[in-house]
Amino acid sequence: MAAVISNSSGTELYVDPTKAIPDLCINDVVLSTPPCYAEETLVQPSAEINTSNSSEKPIVPEISSSDVMVHSAVENLPTSDMKLWTAQRDSAVKLRLEDSDVASLPPVTIHQLFQETVNKYGDYVALASKQGDQWHKMSYKQYYEQCRIAAKGFIKLGLERYHGVGILGFNSAEWFIADVGAIFAGGFAVGIYTTNSAEACHYVAQNCEANIIVVENQKQLQKILQVQDQLPHLKAIIQYKDELKEKRPNLYTWKEFMQLGKDIPDSQLDQIISSQKPNQCCTLIYTSGTTGQPKGVMLSHDNITWTAAAAGKTVRLREATDLQEIVVSYLPLSHIAAQMIDIWLTMKYGGATYFAQPDALKGSLAITLREVRPTAFMGVPRVWEKMQEKMKAVGAKSSTIKRKMATWAKGVGLETNLKKMNGSTPHPMKYHVANKLVFKKVRKALGLDRCTKCYTGAAPITKDTLEFFLSLNIPVYELYGMSESSGPHTISLPDAFRITSCGKVISGCKTKIHQPDSDGSGEILFWGRHVFMGYLNMEDKTHESLDEEGWLHSGDIGKHDENGFLYITGRIKELIITAGGENIPPVPTEDAVKEQVPIISNAMLIGDKKKFLSMLLTLKCNVNADTGEPEDELTPEAIQFCRQIGSKATLVSDIVGGKDTAVYAAIQEGVNSVNEKSTSNAQKVQKWLILEKDFSITGGELGPTMKLKRPVVAKMYKDQIDSFYQDAGTPTENFTPPK
C-alpha cells in the first residue's frame, strides 16, 4: 500500500513502503515523514495518510515583527547528517514537519512563544500565588521580565550552554521563572522530584551536569549539601523560600539571586536567545526505565511549543482574549503532564496558573479549588479517587431523603451521559431536574462549577471512578502519553470519549499498532513533532525506544475500536504505575528484598493502579525431583537463616500466617532496609505477605526459563492482593504484616 504525500509545492510523492521516504524541506528545516506498512495497522483520524482535515485551515500562530523569523531560527544548522534522534546534549535533530494542518506549523523557540504571548496577552494574569489571605498576581509582561532577570542571574553565576539548572521544590512562581530563565540563558531546565533522596538528586544533577540547583527550602537544600562535593559542575545553589539557616559560599536567597545579573546587558542575553534553535534541547524530564536507572528525556523547543499548540487546539482551549482559561498547579512539575499543562499550555493560550499550597494532596487542594474555580483541571487517578471517597463518606452521613435523591440523580446522570457518549444529544426533563437539585451543587462544592475540562492521566484510572463522576455530570476525560511524547498523545473530548478509553490521537500526530494480534492488539507506536529527541548520554536506550524509521515504541499494548478510540490492554514493560502516577520498576526492589532476606525465594511487587506498593513473597524450599513441585521442607540455606535469627522452623508451614515471629521480624527488617534506600515514599513497600507455596513452572507462576509470569501470579493470588488494599487509607511506613 503506497502512501500519497504532497510536498509544499503541491507535488504528490507516491511513497513505496518498501523504500525509505525522502526528506522534504520546509522553511529550511529538514523534516521527515513516517513510513506506512500494509502489514501493520496505522490508525489515524481519517482513512488518508495525512491526519489533517482538509476543510480546516492550519492554525498558524501570528509571528510579530519583533520576533526572530522562523527560518532564521534554524539556519546555519548542518542538515546533511542530521537524524530524528540524538543522545548528545549539544546536537540538533530533524523536525517531523509535514506540509498541511497542525503538523505544518512553523517551528518556534520557547522565547518566540513567550514573546508572542506577551504581545497578545501582556496585561492578563499569568501567575497567582497566595500570600496569607491574598492572591498575589503577576501579569505576562511581569512574568516575562522576571524570566529575563533570572536568565541574567544564571549567566552571572556561570551557567554554561547545554548544562542543567536543577529545580527542586513545590510548584511556585519561582519554579516557573527558574525553568524559563534557565532556557533563556541557554541551559536545560531540569525538574527534580521533591520526594527524591539525596542520592537520587545526585544522579540527576550529575547526569545533566548541573551548574546551578534551585531549591525550595532547608529540607531540600540539605539533600544537595549532602552530595555537593560529588557534583564537580555545580557552581551555585539558590533557595527560593524561607530564610537561609546559615550562610555558605555560593548559596543565595531568591532575592539575592535576582539582583546578581544587573550588570549583564540585554544584548548579551539576546545574543544567547537568538542563537537557540527549535530543534535543539531545552528541557530534561527524568523518568525511570525497567532497570531502575533514571533516563533524561531530551525535549526540544519545538517538542514543547508545538505540543502546546497542537494539544490546545485538540482540547479547544480558548484564547485569553475570548475567555481566559484558569488552572490550579499542584502536581509535581518534574512530571511532563504538570509542565505541559501548567507552564506551556497556559503560556500558549494566555491562561492563568494559580499555585496550590504545598500540602495540596493532604487536604488543602479542595480549598484552593473552591477559591480559584478553575476552567480546566487535571487530576491523577488518586486525586479523583480521594474525591470519590470523601464524597461517599459525606453522603453516608446525609439524611435518608438526601441519600435517595442523590441515588436517583446519579442514576439519571449516568444514563444520560452514557447516551450522550454514544451520540444521543437530547437531555430528558429528569436530567434538568437532577442537574438543578444535585449536579450543580456538587460541582460548586468541589470548586468545579466553571470547569468544562476535567482530565486524568499519568496512571490508569478505574471504570468505577469514571462512572462515579459521570453519574454526577462530571465527565473525566482520559489522556495518554509519556515523557517521551512531550506529554499527551491521545485525548478524550466531550464529543468523543468512551469509558476506559484514552481517546483519539491529538491533531498532527499518528498512532500505529505494531504487529497486531488476531484481536487487533499490539504495541502502541507514536509519530509526531511531540516525539522526543533521545535520552541524554544513552544512545542504546534511545535506539530501544525509537526504531529506525523514527516511531516511538511506548512499551504499552493497546488496540483501537471501530471508531478509532484507543484502549490500553496491557504493558510490555514491567513498570508499575501507581495511582499517584509514579513509575516504579519492580525488579530492583524485588532483588533488593531477596538480597536483604536470604530466606526469600521469589518476590513480586504489586502496585499498578494502587495507592501504595505491596509484595508477595515465597520461601526457599526443596523441590520434588520428579514432579518439580515445591515441597513444604525448607532448604538448608533457609534453615540456616532461621537458626541465625533464633527460629526453629524447618517447614514453610511452620512460618506462614505469622506463626514464626522471628522470621516475620527479620523480613520486616529487610524490607525496612530496602525502603530506606528508595528514592521516594511512593517506592517503599508498605505491605507484604508470605505465600504458602513457592512459585514453579508446574504451578504456572514461572515460564520455561524460570521467568516470573506476573499476570498469572496476579490472577492466582487476586484475593491476597485485594486484601492489601481493602482499607481506605495508606498504611504507615513500618506496617506490621498480618498474622
Swiss-Prot record:
Query: Please, which domain of life does this record's source organism belong to?
Result: Eukaryota
Q: What is its EC number?
A: 6.2.1.3, 6.2.1.15
What Gene Ontology cellular-component terms does the record carry?
Answer: endoplasmic reticulum; membrane
Q: Which family does the record assign?
A: Belongs to the ATP-dependent AMP-binding enzyme family. Bubblegum subfamily.
User: Which positions are annotated as binding ATP?
Assistant: 287-295, 478-483, 556, 571, 684
As for subcellular location, the record says: Cytoplasm
Please give the PROSITE patterns that the UniProt record associates with this protein.
AMP_BINDING (PS00455)
What Pfam families does the annotation carry? AMP-binding (PF00501), AMP-binding_C_3 (PF23562)
Please identify the protein, giving its name as recorded.
Answer: Long-chain-fatty-acid--CoA ligase ACSBG2
Write out the catalysed reaction.
a long-chain fatty acid + ATP + CoA = a long-chain fatty acyl-CoA + AMP + diphosphate; (5Z,8Z,11Z,14Z)-eicosatetraenoate + ATP + CoA = (5Z,8Z,11Z,14Z)-eicosatetraenoyl-CoA + AMP + diphosphate; hexadecanoate + ATP + CoA = hexadecanoyl-CoA + AMP + diphosphate; (9Z)-octadecenoate + ATP + CoA = (9Z)-octadecenoyl-CoA + AMP + diphosphate
InterPro entries to which the protein is assigned, alphabetical: AMP-binding_CS, AMP-dep_synth/lig_dom, ANL_N_sf
Name where it mostly resides. Answer: cytoplasm
Q: Which organism is it from?
A: Xenopus laevis (African clawed frog)
Question: What lineage does the source organism belong to?
Answer: Eukaryota, Metazoa, Chordata, Craniata, Vertebrata
Task: Alphabetically list the UniProt keywords.
Answer: ATP-binding, Cytoplasm, Fatty acid metabolism, Ligase, Lipid metabolism, Nucleotide-binding
> GO molecular-function annotation terms?
arachidonate-CoA ligase activity; ATP binding; long-chain fatty acid-CoA ligase activity
* Protein role: Catalyzes the conversion of fatty acids such as long chain and very long-chain fatty acids to their active form acyl-CoAs for both synthesis of cellular lipids, and degradation via beta-oxidation. Can activate diverse saturated, monosaturated and polyunsaturated fatty acids.
